[in-house]
Design a protein with these regions (language model features):
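Acidic/His metal-coordination segments adjacent to aromatic residues that form catalytic metal sites
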Residues: 257, 327-347, 402-419, 477, ...
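Non-catalytic C-terminal accessory modules of carbohydrate-active enzymes
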Residues: 74-81, 86-128, 132-133, 563-758, ...
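Acidic, contiguous internal or C-terminal segments within carbohydrate-active enzymes
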Residues: 116-159, 662-683, 885-903, 911-913
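Active-site core of glycosidic bond-cleaving carbohydrate-active enzymes
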Residues: 271-303, 379-382, 386, 413, ...
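N-terminal/edge-of-domain interface segments
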Residues: 772-932
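Bacterial Sec-dependent N-terminal signal peptides
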Residues: 1-25, 140
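Acidic/polar, glycine-enriched structural segments that form the non-catalytic walls/loops
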Residues: 23-32, 119-124, 128-137, 141-271, ...
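An extended acidic
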Residues: 26-114, 208-233, 387, 629-639, ...
Length: 932
């Protein structure tokens, strides 16, 4: 018998085990909020302090609830604010306990309609944050009040003495943390005489009734500012659940802006970071001035005066060598590194946020075509690319290590491997650097060459044609094997960074559909909207299929789901992309506990559950998903062109979007599809419009000059045509297609070619590709044979003495130091003791085999099923194999004799980075030369 060690972690004997379903359904839930126009409605809702309103760009916010109870927050001061109705008989009623309350969240505003028929109460209330000062304002309209009643407003300290994450949802340790403190008396009570219209202002810890005219003025100004912000992006579609998104995006994005940079989060994690994807928000929502401010401030955070003076590897011994040592002059902390805080190039962080920052900067140039800013940023771009190369491609094979360069990095370590997502980032950066260099008169050759070599290496080393997807990574250590079960970030970064051919991109989305766990979204509600959800086959996804669970490695995270949906749109898999997008919106914004929330983690994440609100990373991705994915707006102003490739579902008859940069609309009437476009890009002269061809023939009615027209030979799911239109800023252009041939139908088409995973259909003069991949539910399983386990005849068992091969105690595994072999380069890797990951490099676990030892009698351990093994009560009791030098790579054990079965007691140690890779293999060598 031979035991071979394949993986780079540890294996010691082995055992059979099954994994629990980390994505098991949580408790049933239903829609908590319903779309009404641009707002979210709740009826006698139960959520408290879950919808934050933001005003100016400080940390001040007003927490609102499904009923009229509130809290305010700044780092220095937190207050609970309640309203009461005092009846003539002395009874006091809390506003949030009155009989009927319909609440609306319109981005930036919370409105309440409070009714109690038995008491004759009819009150309307609106709450907002002010935009010019750290204040809040309420308007109360008393349509009907009980005789002799009046209102009071009570300000109290909050229950929590300390807030762990600024009072964010799902992460605080104190129950009811924003409720009024039970330990302290109210700080103030303001009695308010009943009037038709009342205005109340919160300022500096206290509330006061405002004079009517002053209140009207402040309220009107605040509401005007709120509406202006919410209406910066407006979308109209046939789907009412999507028509709220414009204001949701702009209000959330405004909440993560601090007038210097885009923040990590609006509530929890309200800190400055150069990553992650929050920085996309500015350009995709029309704030190009804010975007430039963000990029300029972090450009000043790049190290430019510290040359590398230490060579690879530079691992931090104090942190068990799991990550880079924070030392100036090391490969990582030297010229080109972007520090954590804006305008400060003197502080170290433990992430490579360069890649994401640079990608956002390049998108900014795509949106603006600002060559002056490109010249200003050129030296920083050069330093960045040189820094990436010397740190993460030191062997110059044009494939890059990934060193904590994406949001999901906390549980990831690639040990200097060749990684798809980081390599894709570097491909796009080099490709665009070459384009920019040509435009500003710099040398493009080194960047064009590197981009070309990267693409060659990706296609030859990382693309797996048999699987239709890229490898997660190729191992640089051990047996240099390939991880062939990639996470979603591998797929969406590859597609987003343009390393994919159209066929590769589409097939990669099919990999996600068929291999990544899908979590159904179901509702226990009884409304028609709840029924729509249950009939719609909606589902969200986890970020990988890796086990065991570890934070960031296999979460149900909104940004990961949304970026995957964006990749589906980009790949032409539009129907699936839309379904995934809407699933995410239903999950977080309507079924979640905060209306219109762009959160971090989903309710369906079994480890964390729903948490965080208006988190920067998903805010940026959601902005791209709506603008670039659903509406297909993709400017390349550096080359004076704009592409529009709508991602609308096939059954939509209309849609339009308005942003500061563009208005365009789609309208279908009968056989006619009409598109109207008016953009405001100063550096764009042409629009390339890619649209479905629903008929084999059509008449074209154009309201502009058509520069080019062709059929798209790389269409998926249905044929498309491409128009190139002359369209300068401010000029309205239109195209109308009126079908006069046969309607496109898969049933009428014939297969004319088959490629791996795809088939080309043709109907008359139109052709398009469809997937031939089968998901697991469609596979023919009739030939599969169920596994069997024979009863064990205990009397026939013969324990084999292999004690001379034992080379360790089971308990030694995480007490050792696995020092060699280790990567010759600075990297993220498994800690020196073989447990945990770089974020928690000192975590460990005590392996206790005392129970096993205690159960041994006369050197025999008997399992509950009667199988017996020889095992000592003391001393070494296991055969360890490992690719680390601590133990041999393999163990050859002579068994002798003959038998029909062999039973082994086995144990193993692994980690998510080795999931779906064979960690070890046991072979039986027979005297006739055969191997089993």
């Amino acid at each position: 018998m031979r035991i071979n060690r394949f993986g780079y972690t540890l294996t010691f004997l082995l055992t059979l085990a099954s994994s629990s379903d980390i994505y098991a359904q949580r408790a049933e839930r239903s829609l908590q909020y319903f779309p009404e126009g641009r707002g979210f409605a709740s009826y006698n809702g139960k959520n408290r302090y879950t919808r934050a309103l933001y005003g100016g760009h400080s940390d001040f916010r007003l927490e609102t609830s499904d009923r009229p109870v509130f809290a305010t927050f700044t780092k220095k001061e937190k207050r609970n604010i309640r309203f009461f109705l005092h009846l003539a008989d002395g009874k006091r009623l809390n506003f949030d306990e009155l009989e009927l309350c319909t609440a609306y969240y319109f981005p930036g505003q919370r409105k309440y309609y409070i009714r109690n028929s038995s008491l004759g109460i009819d009150i309307d209330m609106t709450a907002m944050c002010c935009y010019d000062n750290d204040e809040a304002i309420w308007r109360i309209v008393c349509n009907k009040m009980p005789e002799g009643s009046h209102i009071s407003c009570v300000v109290s300290m909050i229950e929590a003495k300390h807030l762990y994450r600024n009072g964010d949802m799902g992460v605080e340790t104190t129950p009811n943390f924003f409720e009024a403190s039970k330990e302290h008396e109210p700080l103030m009570t303001t009695e308010i005489k009943p009037e038709k219209e009342i205005y109340i202002r919160y300022n500096d810890g206290s509330v006061a009734k405002m004079p009517l005219n002053d209140g009207k003025t402040l309220f009107a100004v605040t509401q005007l500012q709120s509406n202006h912000l919410a209406n910066q992006v407006v979308i109209n579609t046939p789907d009412k659940f999507l028509n709220t998104l414009g204001g949701v995006l702009t209000s959330a994005a405004d909440g993560i802006w601090d007038e210097k940079v885009w923040l990590h989060g609006a509530v929890g994690w309200r800190v400055q970071l150069p990553g992650w994807r929050a920085g996309y928000s500015g350009d995709f929502l029309g704030w190009h001035d804010r975007a430039r401010t963000h990029f300029s401030n972090y450009a000043e955070s790049m190290v430019t005066n510290i040359e590398q003076k230490f060579s690879h590897p530079m691992q931090d011994a104090a942190l068990n060598s799991a990550r880079a040592e924070k030392k100036w002059g090391s490969p990582m902390y030297s010229n080109g590194y972007i520090c954590r805080y804006p305008n400060k190039a003197d502080n170290m962080n433990h992430y490579d946020m360069n890649l994401c920052y640079i990608d956002e900067l390049l998108w900014h140039l795509n949106w603006t075509g600002d060559l002056n800013f490109a010249r200003e940023m050129w030296q920083k771009l050069k330093l960045h690319l040189a820094w990436e190369k010397r740190n993460f491609d030191p062997d110059n094979n044009h494939l890059y290590d990934a060193y904590a360069c994406i949001w999901a990095s906390d549980g990831l370590y690639y040990d200097s491997g060749d990684v798809t997502h980081s390599t894709a980032y570097n491909y796009r950066a080099n490709k665009m650097a070459a384009e920019i260099a040509e435009l500003i008169g710099e040398d493009a050759t080194p960047y064009r060459t590197e981009a070309e070599e990267i693409l060659k290496a990706i296609n030859s080393k990382l693309w797996m044609n048999d699987r239709g997807v890229w490898a997660e990574y190729n191992d640089n250590m051990g047996l240099k094997r390939q991880h062939d079960a990639p996470a979603v970030w591998t797929v969406y970064h590859a597609i987003d960074s343009d390393i994919a051919t159209p066929h590769q991109a589409y097939r990669a989305t099919e990999y996600v559909t068929n291999n990544i766990p899908h979590v159904p979204i179901k509702s226990s509600g009884i409304t028609k909207d709840d029924e729509m959800i249950n009939a719609g086959d909606y589902a969200t996804i986890s970020s990988s299929n890796w086990m065991p669970y570890d934070w960031s490695v296999n979460n149900v995270a909104f940004a990961e789901v949304m970026h995957t949906a964006l990749a589906f749109f980009q790949a032409g898999n539009k129907e699936a992309g839309f379904k995934l997008m809407k699933s995410c919106i239903l999950d977080g914004m309507y079924m979640g506990c905060s209306p219109g929330n762009i959160g971090q983690i989903s309710h369906y994440d079994a480890a964390r559950g729903e948490c965080y609100r208006d988190f920067g990373d998903p805010v940026g991705v959601a902005s791209r998903l709506v603008v670039q994915g659903l509406f297909g707006i993709k400017p390349d102003a550096l080359h004076r062109r704009l592409t529009i490739n709508p991602g609308f579902p096939k059954d939509w008859a209309n849609a339009d979007i308005t942003t500061p940069d563009i208005f365009y609309s789609f309208k279908r009437e009968g056989t006619s599809d009409k598109y109207e476009i008016k953009h405001n890009f100063a550096n764009v002269d042409t629009v390339t419009l890619r649209i479905p061809a629903r008929y084999t023939k059509f008449d074209i009615k154009n309201g502009c000059q058509i520069l080019d027209y062709r059929c798209d030979n790389e269409s998926f799911d249905m044929p498309h045509v491409i128009f190139k239109l002359l369209a300068k800023a401010g000029q309205k252009v239109s195209i109308e297609l009126k079908g006069n041939g046969s309607k496109i139908s898969k049933s009428k088409a014939k297969v004319v070619r088959v490629n791996t995973g795809l088939a080309l259909l043709q109907q008359e003069n139109r052709a398009w590709w469809i997937s031939t991949a089968l998901d697991e539910s469609e596979r023919d399983k009739s030939s599969l044979i169920a596994g069997q386990f024979s009863d064990i005849n205990v009397d026939a068992l013969e324990p084999i003495d292999i004690s001379k091969h034992f080379n360790a105690k089971v308990t030694d595994i995480f007490r050792n130091r696995y020092e060699s072999p280790r990567s010759p380069y600075t990297t993220l890797t498994i800690p020196i003791h073989g447990y945990s990951e770089w974020c928690h490099p000192k975590d460990t676990v005590n392996i206790d085999d005392s129970g096993l030892r205690k159960a041994i009698n006369d050197s025999i351990f008997t399992a509950p099923n009667g199988i017996k093994w020889l095992s000592p009560k003391e001393g070494n009791n296991i055969v360890y194999t490992s690719l680390f030098d601590n133990y041999p790579d393999e163990a050859l054990i002579s068994v002798g004799g003959s038998a029909s079965h062999a039973y082994l007691m086995m144990a193993g140690s692994t980690n998510p980075m080795q999931c779906n890779i064979n960690n070890a293999v046991v072979e039986f060598l027979y005297t006739d030369g055969t191997i089993q």
